[in-house]
Amino acid sequence: MKTCWKIPVFFFVCSFLEPWASAAVKRRPRFPVNSNSNGGNELCPKIRIGQDDLPGFDLISQFQVDKAASRRAIQRVVGSATLQVAYKLGNNVDFRIPTRNLYPSGLPEEYSFLTTFRMTGSTLKKNWNIWQIQDSSGKEQVGIKINGQTQSVVFSYKGLDGSLQTAAFSNLSSLFDSQWHKIMIGVERSSATLFVDCNRIESLPIKPRGPIDIDGFAVLGKLADNPQVSVPFELQWMLIHCDPLRPRRETCHELPARITPSQTTDERGPPGEQGPPGPPGPPGVPGIDGIDGDRGPKGPPGPPGPAGEPGKPGAPGKPGTPGADGLTGPDGSPGSIGSKGQKGEPGVPGSRGFPGRGIPGPPGPPGTAGLPGELGRVGPVGDPGRRGPPGPPGPPGPRGTIGFHDGDPLCPNACPPGRSGYPGLPGMRGHKGAKGEIGEPGRQGHKGEEGDQGELGEVGAQGPPGAQGLRGITGIVGDKGEKGARGLDGEPGPQGLPGAPGDQGQRGPPGEAGPKGDRGAEGARGIPGLPGPKGDTGLPGVDGRDGIPGMPGTKGEPGKPGPPGDAGLQGLPGVPGIPGAKGVAGEKGSTGAPGKPGQMGNSGKPGQQGPPGEVGPRGPQGLPGSRGELGPVGSPGLPGKLGSLGSPGLPGLPGPPGLPGMKGDRGVVGEPGPKGEQGASGEEGEAGERGELGDIGLPGPKGSAGNPGEPGLRGPEGSRGLPGVEGPRGPPGPRGVQGEQGATGLPGVQGPPGRAPTDQHIKQVCMRVIQEHFAEMAASLKRPDSGATGLPGRPGPPGPPGPPGENGFPGQMGIRGLPGIKGPPGALGLRGPKGDLGEKGERGPPGRGPNGLPGAIGLPGDPGPASYGRNGRDGERGPPGVAGIPGVPGPPGPPGLPGFCEPASCTMQAGQRAFNKGPDP
């Protein structure tokens, strides 16, 4: 009992030390494959300043075991401690790396091999290599062999004569017990020393070693008799260190403590009384990783990953489609006419050669449309083209409205031209004109830069975007992955230099029509073609997009306030529009009431296209005017005086994009305008862009309880739990009724001799006997009076029972008695501690029964990192949308600049589409 207090203290201290010791061991060193400490390309440096400065090489990283675990090729398990990570290598994986990638200059003369691993199942009885280096023909050169048949560890190496030498360490039964073990072998110049669990086992002499063949492979976990077969085991740590004495300084804190059994075993005592509650225990160590959860929903597309390393040259691709015409090369010298040869087999269509100086041939049949080329760089501004001939007379325009002149009614003959009006609103998009004739060839653009030569290969599987790391070693050959998603379009490469003129190839057969290509980039604006013939009146087009804002107009005179209209219904709040261009600085307004400081709002989304405006009244039909001939352009006249505000002019053509004006001062809030009439239903607008991810919504109300599901199948039987903690001692039970006297038991078998009493014990017993019977002994020593010898008396009655004597010497142990009757079950013990998480079981059989109801929709994930992707291709036009609710009429816009009118369009009906961008009603 004196040592019982040491046990909880021992575990209390260990619970604090274990995380620190485990954490120190868990961080495996990751060193480069080659050390360049001495300027050479050797594995270990020749100059050894200090043993602790020598490098080590983590074989788990070199064999990419951890990466294979992330790809689920192998299983990641708990190691020798709760904080350790290990890898369960099965017999279906092959860890094999070219030796040249790991040890380009071979192994050093002195080094040490260290590993922490565990064998389970049938591996305990197998003869296998935990690490081995093979030559180019597959023969062993260096290796560490674990032989479960002879319970030994064998270090094999290649001698100077090329023969395989071995150093066998035997009698290692403690290594084959399904527990975690740590073996280390220090290879010195003339000896090899084995350490098992940081205990030195033996040092064996070894012969000088020859160089290894680096054209072979380094492997992990292979059978000794068949190196192609893998052996299942669990690997936590494997290291090659340049210090051969490293095993002497290594510790084994990561290994679990092994409790040795006691020499004697007593019978189990009765349960003790319940003690007082103990002090609160220390914080528990972090738990191990939980089991993998269900597959989550597909996340949003991630940002484009960094450019991967160039792949290996792919297999030759299929013949590509004919490329675009190349640049015109210099004229070659005419060759001599050769003799006519025999007709050969049709050859493979050659690449398009440069035009020669042959006689023009007859026009060929129209060819198939080529693939659209990549958008070239914008060339320099060309010289102005020559003035084109006047176009044919246009069709008669619609009848104009009755004009006014200085307030007079209709002019008797013809009204003089009025002042130039303000530019009208942009007109609706016109119908597509007929294809114009080919214009004059433009000037040759500048020579483009040379493009990179692309490699033709099959489409490879797109890997997950990883961090840009150092170039790793060649990994194991994996299975061919699924076809990845289409990558982003690359930047167009620069124009390549013209190649040498090719030989004139034979005319190949016309090729089959290729598939429809993707929509090409918008080309440069061509030279305007000649006016085409008048086309039939087309259907009304869809609403055109808003035009580019015009130049800021001059400040107009304030209009007269209109009569107040009836109070309209409260309109729906409009979508925040796109910020307008910067206006010109307005006049300083009156100081308004100071508003409350508002918070900075988020950027608004692009507004949707509003409904068309109200249809204005149709004017009276005017008389058709006679069309005059187009006169020459007159010289610009002198600037006239500023006239009075004229009547609105004819709709002007869209002006060039204006420069953004200065930001104007905050204007005074105007009075609400009169209620407008109900506008016509507009056509459905184009689908807007996808909005940003909204904030997480509030949790919804609790749903009603679902129907109880069908009972599931009975699960597999769980593993037996750990024995519970010994329960408290129960209260003494009532005294039982005296039982009947049992039958005399059989004599026991002669037991083993008891323990011999010590000399000290004998002295104590003798002293106690002498003290108790000293008076009787002294009386017996007196000389008695001499007398006649009397007759022996009758035996007296039995005296009273004497006092209980002292404990005698321990007797010899008797034979073991017959087993007693099974006693009643004991009291229920306290709940035992939670056991360690067991290994992940095999996948069970598929369940039966109908599928369950789908789970609740999870909350949206956190927004991904901000990135700026490239603009995607224009999408197809969507179906017409539902007409939106008419918006609140906006405030009147500022007056525009004075408009202008081309003579060819002066006869258009004034105001026909001045304020209506939609079709006629």
From Swiss-Prot:
Keyword Metal-binding found: yes
Disulfide bonds: 44-242, 198-252
Nonhelical region (NC4): region residues: 24-268
UniProt main location, coarse: secreted
Region (Nonhelical region (NC2)): 757-786
Chain spans, region Triple-helical region (COL3): 269-405
Glycosylation sites: 171
Similarity-based family: Belongs to the fibril-associated collagens with interrupted helices (FACIT) family.
Name the record gives this protein: Collagen alpha-1(IX) chain
Species of provenance: Homo sapiens (Human)
